[in-house]
């Protein structure tokens, strides 16, 4: 009788370990899937950028440095070895793209260019998707990391060498409150 109880306890423990292990694997896979959604949007943006660069190229020689920086950052995003590196390059690229859009305000012909307007809309939509995907990734990564730290799954995670997922943080430049100057009387007059 005690032999059957011992076997039953061992079976319950093994089933519990399998259940927790599978739960951790699912959470890790969801984190990887969430990252792949970001990666898809980064690739989409990288595919749109050559068209934007070609469209903007003829509208000002002093912006050439900005276009070269965009090309360089685009390559960094594509060749990043980790999600954190990809997002660091991506954040810098986002700032450069915003700079291109700001400079375009000085060129009425460019602002009226239908191809430019389409690209601007596509890139804006893609940036919004990247932002949403980052939020989703951080949420899923947070859930996964909680499972890694909560008892008893932390014991199983340690036994099978599960590693926590990195969060994607917002760069300090983007957290800063923008300075707005409407002139001396506050109305731009």
UniProtKB/Swiss-Prot annotation:
The lineage of its organism: Bacteria, Bacillati, Bacillota, Bacilli, Lactobacillales. Residues 110-138 form a coiled coil. It is a single-pass membrane protein. Belongs to the LemA family. GO terms for cellular component: plasma membrane. Disruption phenotype: No effect on extracellular glucosyltransferase activity, nor on growth characteristics. InterPro entries: LemA-like_dom_sf (IPR023353), MamQ_LemA (IPR007156). It comes from the Bacteria. Keywords: Cell membrane, Coiled coil, Membrane, Transmembrane, Transmembrane helix. This is Protein LemA. Its main location: membrane. Gene3D superfamilies: LemA-like domain. The chain crosses the membrane at residues 1-21. It is found in: Cell membrane. Induction: Expression is maximal during the early to mid-log stage of growth and decreases after. Does not respond to heat shock up to 43 degrees Celsius. Part of the lemA-htpX operon.
